[in-house]
Amino acid sequence: MTVYRTIVADPPWPYAGMGPVGTGGRGAAYVRNSPSPSSVARYGSMSIDDLKAIEIPTAKDAHLYLSTTNAFMVEAHELARSWGFVPKTILTWGKVKDDGSPSSKTGYYFRGATEHVIFAVRGSLRLTSDHAEPTLWLWPRLPHSVKPDRFYEMVERVSPGPYLELFARRRRYGWDAWGNEAPTEAEEPTP
């Protein structure tokens, strides 16, 4: 069994439990453009306890890139710790339109135009390159849970393999992919 030194995870956060106004769900309210119950059902979700119970064959010294939204920032930190990682910093993807303006779609309270990645470390693994990577990326919005290739390229520059993408929707060349939507074949690298 492969033991991974770098894990990228985009968990199926349980938005269904947040509920509309008046349901008592976490105190959050559905607002116009919030994730609809049908979109939540389309993508499925897992409870926080089920996410914490996942066992990942991880090296003693490893990196975790854990995607989250504003609504699950606290739970994401808890999840990283439950998997044996210590959160170190937050990387933010500012989703922009072609003209550079924010591409906000859904959200609780405010319309979200960002997605966050908690960078966490297990053991004492350092970055493999200098600290020239920014903590803010201004990249176009992509389909649900799809990350830009530039994100994976950055991960490969600063974190060692073997690589695992957990809850993958595509299979990147040179990476293992776990998830009920992960294709069986890896995408060939583009020249």
What does each of the following model-derived ranges do?
Residues 1-191:
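Class I S-adenosyl-L-methionine-dependent methyltransferase catalytic core
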